[in-house]
Amino acid sequence: MDSSDSSCQEWCSHGQYWLELGPTDLMERKGSLTLRSHHKKYSKPVLVYSWHRDRETYPKDYDIEGPEEVKKLCNSTYRRLGTSEPPVWISETREKMAQVCLNTKLAKIKSKALLNEETMNSGIIERDTGLPATGFGALFTRHSPDWSKMCTLTTYAEEYAPPYEYQPLGDPCQDDDYSIVHRKCRSQFTDLDGSKRVGINTWHDESGIYANSYVKRKLYSLTGGPIAPFLK
């Protein structure tokens, strides 16, 4: 029996056979496939590397095995945001991306405009190049004068043209004798209820100023009395 044990130890002493046997503490090593550990239970931390260590970012208030009698699972370490942190919270990604602005080598070159007061000169565009201004061979492409004719021309104006030329009647509102004095404006004191109030501000207006007040003061003299004269 002793001879067999000595031969086994001699056989295992060679380095090439150590990987075949494997470590002797495989069943007790933390992080092994058996997950045999005396101070840790199977939970979310075992899914990552170094699961047997206490994670710093793990919410301490979410520990269901804590000493508190009443568990508050809705609380977490993120409750401290807004108290010990600055008022404007900046994410870690934004903080790392802002390092580009601090490094002068990575700073972007200011873009320069192609057209400015110096480069924009009408003489450059309107110079005589010896080429036709429009049409084939022109340096700058331009639309023909009747380019927008298709947009303004309608079927009615094209097919139903008037057979004779005539002078259309002018707008009566453009006459010099036209006035809005005779129009009755909506009273601000008697016509209170109604849906014809214009504008955004629809509250009761008691200013006494109407749309034709300026025209009435211009047409009627203020010394003639309160009764307006009859106009023929």
Swiss-Prot record:
Transmembrane segments: 97-115
Entry function: Microtubule inner protein (MIP) part of the dynein-decorated doublet microtubules (DMTs) in cilia axoneme, which is required for motile cilia beating.
Location in or out of the cell: Cytoplasm, Cytoskeleton, Cilium axoneme; Cytoplasm, Cytoskeleton, Flagellum axoneme; Cell membrane; Cytoplasm
Tissue and organ distribution: Expressed in trachea multiciliated cells.
Region (Mn): 153-163
Residues glycosylated per entry: N75
Gene Ontology biological-process entries: flagellated sperm motility
Residues on Cytoplasmic side: 116-232
Protein name: Cilia- and flagella-associated protein 95
Record key words, sorted: Cell membrane, Cell projection, Cilium, Cytoplasm, Cytoskeleton, Flagellum, Glycoprotein, Membrane, Transmembrane, Transmembrane helix
InterPro entries to which the protein is assigned, alphabetical: CFAP95 (IPR027905)
GO cellular component labels: axonemal A tubule inner sheath; axonemal microtubule; cytoplasm; plasma membrane; sperm flagellum
Main localisation: cytoplasm
Topological domains annotated Extracellular: 1-96
Top-level division of the source organism's lineage: Eukaryota
Topology in membrane: Single-pass membrane protein
Subunit structure, as described in the record: Microtubule inner protein component of sperm flagellar doublet microtubules. Interacts with MYH9. Interacts with MYH10.
